[in-house]
């Protein structure tokens, strides 16, 4: 086996070091000040406390760099497609798929399994189309099940891989948030120490402690962003990917069992009854009411 350079790891390590270095020398801007407002209205001025580009840079940049080190570059670049799938809604019509399988079963039982070959191009599902084509060419039902199960396992493995990347990103985010906070506290304490070395005339204790507390609040913002991205972005996305994967795999399991049943020349009514066991009871009752 030939070894090759993993450029994703190199890019991640170098970019991570640069990210931390930039955070260390980030130019200091004016510290936002809370201006209390009268009455019970919202204090919109307080929002300025939470807009810290440096904090977002450390958390997001650090998470991306660590992910590049942990995973191949190709897998990280594929995250765009993963996030797109999360945003787009996809409906899994289990009963509709069962109806399509029953139609194929009726045609196969009437005209033979080879008659399904003419309608392969009309099947939208790639997994189902490949499965029907395989059923036409494969005589051994056990081998057919093995091939379809292998395909299904490969799909499941890819789904788990995408979920794993997002879960690792969720784990990295609070860690980089804490790293940014520690970095901010170190810079803040050093500034306080340098201020204390000035003459007593220039050194105002009240002002320095006010600056210290203000700087501590700014430093803690990075932890806030780390926790926010982990629990509001990455973990919910990973959970949604898991739910969607479970539904997709169940739909493909229905297809798998349906193709095996068609290959075994089972009666369409028995095929429907068997496949409907995959469907939730409430959805099953809705389907029965439509038929009535």
Where are these regions (language model features)?
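Helix-termination/interfacial motifs at the ends of transmembrane alpha-helices
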Residues: 4, 11-14, 18-40, 154-244
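Large intracellular
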Residues: 2-8, 19-164, 247-292
């Amino acid at each position: 086996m030939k070894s090759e350079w993993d450029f994703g790891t190199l890019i991640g390590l170098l970019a991570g070091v640069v990210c931390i270095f930039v955070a260390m020398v980030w130019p200091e801007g004016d510290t936002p000040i809370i201006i209390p407002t009268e009455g019970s209205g919202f204090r919109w001025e307080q929002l300025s406390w939470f807009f810290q580009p440096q904090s977002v840079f450390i958390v997001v940049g650090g998470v991306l760099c660590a992910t590049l080190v942990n995973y191949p570059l190709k897998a990280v670049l594929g995250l765009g497609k993963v996030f797109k799938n999360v945003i787009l809604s996809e409906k899994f019509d289990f009963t509709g798929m069962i109806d399509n399988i029953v139609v194929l079963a009726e045609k196969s039982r009437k005209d033979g399994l080879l008659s399904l070959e003419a309608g392969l191009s009309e099947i939208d599902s790639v997994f189902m189309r490949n499965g029907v084509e395989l059923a036409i060419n494969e005589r051994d039902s056990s081998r057919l099940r093995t091939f379809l199960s292998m395909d299904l396992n490969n799909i499941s493995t890819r789904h788990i891989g995408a979920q794993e990347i997002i879960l690792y990103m969720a784990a990295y985010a609070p860690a980089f948030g804490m790293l940014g906070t520690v970095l901010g506290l170190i810079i803040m304490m050093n500034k306080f120490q340098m201020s204390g070395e000035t003459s007593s005339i220039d050194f105002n204790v009240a002002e320095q402690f006010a600056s210290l507390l203000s700087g501590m609040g700014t430093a803690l913002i990075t932890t806030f962003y780390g926790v926010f991205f982990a629990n509001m972005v990455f973990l919910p996305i990973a959970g949604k990917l898991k739910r969607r994967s479970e539904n997709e795999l169940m739909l493909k399991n229905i297809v798998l069992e349906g193709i095996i049943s068609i290959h075994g020349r089972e009666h369409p009514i028995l095929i429907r009854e068997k496949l409907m066991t995959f469907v939730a009871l409430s959805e099953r009752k809705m389907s029965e009411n439509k038929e009535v």
